[in-house]
Amino acid sequence: MKRLYPYLFFLFLCLSAQAQEFKVYQFPADKVPAIDGNTHDWDCVPADYKITEAALKEDEGKHAQPDTTTLKVSVKVGWCAETQKLYFLYEAYDNYWRFSENSLNTDIFEVVVDGDCSGGPFIDRFHPTAPKDVWQAWFKFHGCHAQNYHIFTPAHGNDWCMLWGPQVWLKQKPYADYAYQYSFKEGEAGKLVLEFYITDRKSTRLNSSHSV
């Protein structure tokens, strides 16, 4: 089956600022993962598709390499052409989970997706013509070239992520779904499993009644 290698920028803590190209597994429509937090649907994905903490980079220059005694991660990504969705399995061990505060200062898994590799800025303040009306830049520009998901690990109450941009429906069904598995409490060590899918914004243009 043909393999897809779109550009996905994974910013777990801080991945290298330089773009990296990762393998994405091709799921047939009848084999897409059930979003239930169970990892068995991912057993078919080859080991060399897995992204680990070895790909992480601490960007403040305090550590030469990740400390696996404090954080270990494993990420697998899949794509289904029929559903036009990206599927993620994120597994992480942390020696201290922080998630009770409703802010981005808690543990998150951050994903930025540029579905057609069009490139260019996607944040309102970097609008190429710098419109005087900041709200026009927000609604008409922010999140167009790429979509930025700040995914809480685990969820903040009923909210599983902060989608940075006005297209908030992209984090809701049928465009996204998620499931967690964990047993730790705030401040404890433990393993978290996060399974979710998201829909590339560009593939929603012909399928959505929302204004994009």
Listing of model-derived features with the role each one plays in the protein:
Residues 1-23:
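Bacterial Sec-dependent N-terminal signal peptides
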